[in-house]
């Protein structure tokens, strides 16, 4: 079969126009290959068809740098979208947007390749049953439960522990649920991507994760598509291996940002705040594919950058409408030395509902939040007048709140090398039992320090008894 070959007629930054003089135009989203004779070291440049301009010309978005391209060069129609390797051979590897390995560990000999553009699962295939995905992290399971096949936003500044929580979840899902994880680095710093790779490797979690990177230095075409590449990898594990997959996207804002960079080059009129007019569609086509089916699920954790802390900006505002909950990391809590530094009052989850998690879980979670909220309100009085001026009831509330606050901390498996404390995975029943006991006053005789950086409540009791023995001796 003869190849369908076009000629480059115009190059503007990341946008390349190609003419097919015989009128046999490739479809939208088809990949074209361009061999750049001026750069013989580089493999073929992949461009994705974005528009049909008329006069047998298509406008494409380049997935890599376009330096060295000149008019008249051949562009070969591959007849299919960008295809990426999926399945076992891609696990433990770093891929780029077009599925090529970038970790210098040799080629990926995959048996299956998936197109990055795929339809969302049909309504009949989707599983509408709401289930809780146990993460083994006390504060998350109790106050911000993750829905299986849901989407959670992770909000946090620099250095409050976003990456550590992500790594612990990759570790726990792999060990407890036997699931795979896919990490999409969208427009993030190359240094952070490198750090994550080495941290996952050192923690022994790399063999359960696929990393897909399109960093800040990549052209906008790559950054606008790398999340779809990662999603195709995750869909394989869900649909063919019937697994519960975790998909991490860091950062979902950069996906939108890349789309807006390309949009102007494609000649579209900008909409609000200069974003692309197709903002809702672009994000929707990605988010609708992240869902539970009758055979498996993709649960997504998405780091969300909020430009200028303005939550009404179109990019975060559009993202919010897709999220099932928000996990907010707080610098104030990190400064207290409480990790994971999840803000128990700011974080929300759609499934913290008695019909989903059960009456007991819901009641304990709400009581924990009430006690912490009361403590927050009393902090000003304590700072000015001291504890002695509080009523006996308030003193008890403060004492229990401080125990709860410390019991919300937890040593992580992936941080063992730094802390020297063995990581703990806590079952949901143990988490609920522990907090219920603190609220009911069963552990009022114990010191605050007995609850710090532990797993289940039994460990706190054991720590207390050991301390008592030492004091007696």
Curated annotation (Swiss-Prot):
Location relative to the cell: Cell inner membrane
Enzyme Commission no: 7.1.2.2
Keyword list, A-Z: ATP synthesis, ATP-binding, Cell inner membrane, Cell membrane, CF(1), Hydrogen ion transport, Ion transport, Membrane, Nucleotide-binding, Translocase, Transport
Superkingdom per UniProt: Bacteria
Gene3D superfamilies reported in the protein's UniProt record: 2.40.10.170, Bovine Mitochondrial F1-atpase, Atp Synthase Beta Chain, Chain D, domain 3, P-loop containing nucleotide triphosphate hydrolases
Cross-referenced InterPro entries: AAA+_ATPase, ATP-synt_VA_C, ATP_synth_F1_bsu, ATPase_a/bsu_AS, ATPase_alpha/beta_chains, ATPase_F1/V1/A1_a/bsu_N, ATPase_F1/V1/A1_a/bsu_N_sf, ATPase_F1/V1/A1_a/bsu_nucl-bd
Cell membrane keyword on record: yes
Similarity comment text for this entry: Belongs to the ATPase alpha/beta chains family.
Self-association and partners: F-type ATPases have 2 components, CF(1) - the catalytic core - and CF(0) - the membrane proton channel. CF(1) has five subunits: alpha(3), beta(3), gamma(1), delta(1), epsilon(1). CF(0) has three main subunits: a(1), b(2) and c(9-12). The alpha and beta chains form an alternating ring which encloses part of the gamma chain. CF(1) is attached to CF(0) by a central stalk formed by the gamma and epsilon chains, while a peripheral stalk is formed by the delta and b chains.
Protein name per UniProt: ATP synthase subunit beta
Source organism of this protein record: Desulfovibrio desulfuricans (strain ATCC 27774 / DSM 6949 / MB)
């Amino acid at each position: 079969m003869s190849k369908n070959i076009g000629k480059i007629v115009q190059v503007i930054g990341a946008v390349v126009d190609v003419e097919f003089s015989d009128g046999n135009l490739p479809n939208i989203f088809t990949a074209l290959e361009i061999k750049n004779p001026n750069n013989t070291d580089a493999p073929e440049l992949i461009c994705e068809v974005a528009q049909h301009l008329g006069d047998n010309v298509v406008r494409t978005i380049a997935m890599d740098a376009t330096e060295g391209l000149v008019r008249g060069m051949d562009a070969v129609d591959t007849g299919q979208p960008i295809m990426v390797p999926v399945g076992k051979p891609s696990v433990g590897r770093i891929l780029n947007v077009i599925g090529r390995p970038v970790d210098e560990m040799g080629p990926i000999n995959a048996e299956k390749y998936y197109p990055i553009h795929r339809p969302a699962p049909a309504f009949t295939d989707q599983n509408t049953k709401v289930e809780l995905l146990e993460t083994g992290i006390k504060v998350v399971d109790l106050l911000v439960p993750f829905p299986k096949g849901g989407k959670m936003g992770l909000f946090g500044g620099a250095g409050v522990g976003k990456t550590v929580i992500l790594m612990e979840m990759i570790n726990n899902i792999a060990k407890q649920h036997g699931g795979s994880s896919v990490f999409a680095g969208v427009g993030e710093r190359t240094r952070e991507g490198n750090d994550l790779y080495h941290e996952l490797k050192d923690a022994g979690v790399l063999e359960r994760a696929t990393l897909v990177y399109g960093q800040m230095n990549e052209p906008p075409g790559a950054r606008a598509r790398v999340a779809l590449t990662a999603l195709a990898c995750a869909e394989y594990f869900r649909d063919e291996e019937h697994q519960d997959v975790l998909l991490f996207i860091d950062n979902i804002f950069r996906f939108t940002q890349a789309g807006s960079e390309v949009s102007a080059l494609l000649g579209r009129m900008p909409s609000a705040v200069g974003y692309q007019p197709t903002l809702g569609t672009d994000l929707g086509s990605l988010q609708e594919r992240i869902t539970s089916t009758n055979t498996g699920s993709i649960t997504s954790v998405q780091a969300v950058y909020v430009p200028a802390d303005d939550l009404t900006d179109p990019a975060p505002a559009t993202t919010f409408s897709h999220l099932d909950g928000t996990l907010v990391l707080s610098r104030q809590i990190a400064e207290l030395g409480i990790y994971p530094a999840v803000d128990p009052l700011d974080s929300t989850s759609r499934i913290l509902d008695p019909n989903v998690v059960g009456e007991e879980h819901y009641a304990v979670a709400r009581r924990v939040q009430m006690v912490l909220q009361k403590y927050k309100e009393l902090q000003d009085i304590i700072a000015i007048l001291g504890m002695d001026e509080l009523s006996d009831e308030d003193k008890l509330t403060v004492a229990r709140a401080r125990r709860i606050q410390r019991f919300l901390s937890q040593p992580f498996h992936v941080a063992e090398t730094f802390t020297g404390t063995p990581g703990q995975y806590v079952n949901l029943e143990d988490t609920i039992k522990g907090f219920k006991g603190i609220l009911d006053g069963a552990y009022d005789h114990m010191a605050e320090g007995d609850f710090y950086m532990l797993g289940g409540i039994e460990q706190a009791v054991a720590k207390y008894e050991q301390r008592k023995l030492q004091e007696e001796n």
